[in-house]
Amino acid sequence: MNPNCARCCKIVYPTEKVNCLDKFWHKACFHCETCKMTLNMKNYKGYEKKPYCNAHYPKQSFTMVADTPENLRLKQQSELQSQVRYKEEFEKNKGKGFSVVADTPELQRIKKTQDQISNIKYHEEFEKSRMGPSGGEGLECERRDPQESSYRRPQEQQQPHHIPASTPVYQQPQQQPAAQSYGGYKEPAAPASIQRSAPGGGGKRYRAVYDYSAADEDEVSFQDGDTIVNVQQIDDGWMYGTVERTGDTGMLPANYVEAI
């Protein structure tokens, strides 16, 4: 059924229908309320569901109110009521405030990572408290660099150990029995039957808990179980000392050795 025009109240057929301001109009009836200028959907402005042109669109004006004592009192009372209501709502919602966060895959990944970090820290503290202060150093080094140890060990087995030819010694066999693993702790490999005597000296003595291959000229290579003498601490990550088996002196990583 065809609707009626909002202005002339006659039937509006689809060919001349204008649907605007929640009403139906003839194209000729859709004009400004003041100047009767024909309008369209691009240049009309609606006010109280009536069409107006841009020139005759009603302007909103503000009424000036005198700043009398009565008005000041009402203004102050309104502000006090707003503050009281705000404080009441604040006290009511105190401790209950929370923000809703979308459960995205990125947030799930971050939450899972935080749970894993917390679990690792808990087990680390538990192992330290169970082993005591003296037995926890080797495990700490083992936990700190397990990947570096497994990465460097095959490289050390492939390369023969360099021993100066000036002193006749028996060469250590390359293939050594694999170190057995109990939990997170690895037994050191069996040392060579005959080792070259290195000049002893004072200072701190450390024992290697991993194999290490020198990556620079000022570093030294050593094997698991070697004794490092004359050790001097450079910083938190590096030391300087002499490998007692080979007599080489240079820098070595601090997390590859433990104090004797």
UniProtKB/Swiss-Prot annotation:
Reported function: Plays an important role in the regulation of dynamic actin-based, cytoskeletal activities. Agonist-dependent changes in LASP1 phosphorylation may also serve to regulate actin-associated ion transport activities, not only in the parietal cell but also in certain other F-actin-rich secretory epithelial cell types.
PTM comment: Phosphorylated.
Organism: Bos taurus
Compartment annotation: Cytoplasm, Cell cortex; Cytoplasm, Cytoskeleton
Compositionally skewed regions (Basic and acidic residues) per UniProt: 140-155
Biased composition regions of type Low complexity, renumbered to the chain: 171-180
PROSITE patterns: LIM_DOMAIN_1, LIM_DOMAIN_2, NEBULIN, SH3
Domain LIM zinc-binding: 5-56
Residue ranges of the region described as Disordered: 123-204
Boundaries of every SH3 domain copy: 201-260
Subunit (UniProt): Interacts with F-actin. Interacts with ANKRD54. Interacts with KBTBD10.
UniProt xrefs under Pfam families: LIM, Nebulin, SH3_9
GO biological process terms on file: monoatomic ion transport
InterPro entries to which the protein is assigned, alphabetical: Lasp1_SH3, LIM-SH3_domain_protein, Nebulin_repeat, SH3-like_dom_sf, SH3_domain, Znf_LIM
Keywords: Acetylation, Actin-binding, Cytoplasm, Cytoskeleton, Ion transport, LIM domain, Metal-binding, Methylation, Phosphoprotein, Repeat, SH3 domain, Transport, Zinc
This protein's name: LIM and SH3 domain protein 1
A GO molecular-function annotation: metal ion binding
Modified residues (N6-methyllysine): K75
Phosphothreonine carried by residues: T68, T104
Gene3D superfamilies for the chain: Cysteine Rich Protein (2.10.110.10), SH3 Domains (2.30.30.40)
Record-listed Phosphoserine modification sites: S99, S118, S134
UniProt modified residues of type N-acetylmethionine: M1
First-listed, main subcellular location of the protein, grouped into a coarse class: cytoplasm
Positions of modified residues (N6-succinyllysine): K112
